[in-house]
Swiss-Prot record:
Name of this protein: Sigma non-opioid intracellular receptor 1
Effect of E144G: No effect on ligand-binding
Effect ascribed to mutating E172G: Reduces ligand-binding. No effect on subcellular localization
Gene it is expressed from: SIGMAR1
Compartment(s): Nucleus inner membrane; Nucleus outer membrane; Nucleus envelope; Cytoplasmic vesicle
GO biological process: lipid transport; nervous system development; protein homotrimerization; regulation of neuron apoptotic process; regulation of postsynapse assembly
Annotated organism of origin: Homo sapiens (Human)
Top-level taxonomy: Eukaryota, Metazoa, Chordata, Craniata, Vertebrata
Amino acid sequence: MQWAVGRRWAWAALLLAVAAVLTQVVWLWLGTQSFVFQREEIAQLARQYAGLDHELAFSRLIVELRRLHPGHVLPDEELQWVFVNAGGWMGAMCLLHASLSEYVLLFGTALGSRGHSGRYWAEISDTIISGTFHQWREGTTKSEVFYPGETVVHGPGEATAVEWGPNTWMVEYGRGVIPSTLAFALADTVFSTQDFLTLFYTLRSYARGLRLELTTYLFGQDP
């Protein structure tokens, strides 16, 4: 019995050590990356259009991002609004840019929703275009509410409760180990809604983003 208990503790210690080493490797890898976008850049651009009709704001934002970062934003024919079910909430996203270490997307809900934010190996920031964003941080007893023009930052490893009012739309930027966020983003789709067409759309959007980045890296930007 004591031998079995000791063996379990040894395995637990080994797993913790592996996790610690893996975490260090991940952060060292991120430290070597050159990023296309900056969090404040995305937030500042989004703030320019806060309060406008969200569709008008999004169209103007896309034009500006393409001007500033040619070869890094998906073309119109590959932009698609896709449902997202995760953490008990439901929204929709339109992916503009994706790589292994960062992404830019449009996100929101026409009806309102609430649930768990998830924990990520990534920093995620949302700048609100319209509506309201309520956030209840882990370890606190009060929630905060954010309005158009404000930016909500979700740090790596953090967890919060989130709630969006009806017709809340925002611009989201993520930086970190982006493939690790897909497990949370797709879990409800796989194990709850079983909407495998949405699963396909989500993975296809991410694959298109990766393909665009690879093409730009290999062949340069379009003139």
